């Protein structure tokens, strides 16, 4: 495939045009008076949204050189969304401003390497300032404020806060479509996994087609149970104690399974057998989690516990277990609260130390399962278009609330960034030459979110930014009420984690663009057919 190559100024200008194409589309959505963007979808109706990352993902630019720029900024939005789940519009805007400001200086003869050193120093200073300004939050109304700002909907804010309060900041909050017009919240306490009963003969509640066990003995086995002589001694002890039993093992086959089924039909025993979920190390880790939650010991020959010799002391219990054909839910396990908390801390350490995204995601899932219940927010609306739009906002709100609970909040509306920009201008005086220029470039970029929030409200952004710069910490401009004041008290707040990742990702992409000397793209095929040569402007 033939390539087209553009060098220095041409390459950078092409990239900047692509950056602008994407960022200008996204920035109209910023702030309480921001607008929506309509996306044409190949399937179903058009999607109306103000979610930055959803819009960014949809944009590809025709000119291949410009498209490089668009894709680079798209990566800022996507990465910010992956880390913090919100703040994608702010990140896109910061990247655009920083790239434009930086390229202007490069065109005027600044050294890109020195500029980058300045931007890097300024980024670090900004992060330090953000941390210094952070206010920790815990009260439900503070969480509700964060969620309300993110979703622009008070009802959603309250529901998200309630969900977080019930399941904790590490708990699972899922979003589903509601069958009604109302948006509602359901909480299920306990730990669940996606495996159901091995035989429908275990069902004892025919209305719901589930097996329900009250205060059962819970037997956890690391390997397969395939030998009846090994299994029978422990099973007989359980039958003698007159308790129902839940058995979770890698698999239960042959005679042991037949024995359980036959005795369940005869009602001599109330039992359910379930395969353990996942594979390999994940399965092992999850079984160990279950053991802690239910106060059981996993039967595992590797650690010297054989099924044939195991006594009732290996059994755990829970208040209630419900098993459907594809899910098992254990409610109120008998595990010691301190042991469960120690297990959570161990998983948190794994999350912090692992380099693999996949491992981290799986560990986060385990942490969420261990952190108590599962909250389900069912989103209702009159039309499918509206439901989809609202679901995106609810997901943003959950992410924002979680981020705020983790790292605290700052004044929203871009105000904190404007004030940090003032600090950067003073900080720049400690540097020389192009490094100083780099620090000033980030300072200029940091005022852009506040500028566009004001501009989207139909006001003069420059005037408002100048006024915010003189205000003390936590004060700024509220674009919803069009008044200045203490934004934290008014509930106009941003999670530090969201702003933090927006700044880091924008700075990272801008530094890459500033040091770009050439861009290479595939030569468009139809051009060769028509003219025998590619052209580029």
Curated annotation (Swiss-Prot):
Top-rank taxon, per record: Bacteria
Positions bound to ATP: 29-32, 86-90, 413, 478-480, 494
Cleavable signal peptide: none
Gene Ontology cellular-component terms listed: cytoplasm
Single GO MF annotation: isomerase activity
Localization terms from the record: Cytoplasm
Family of this protein: Belongs to the chaperonin (HSP60) family.
Protein name: Chaperonin GroEL 1
Gene: groEL1
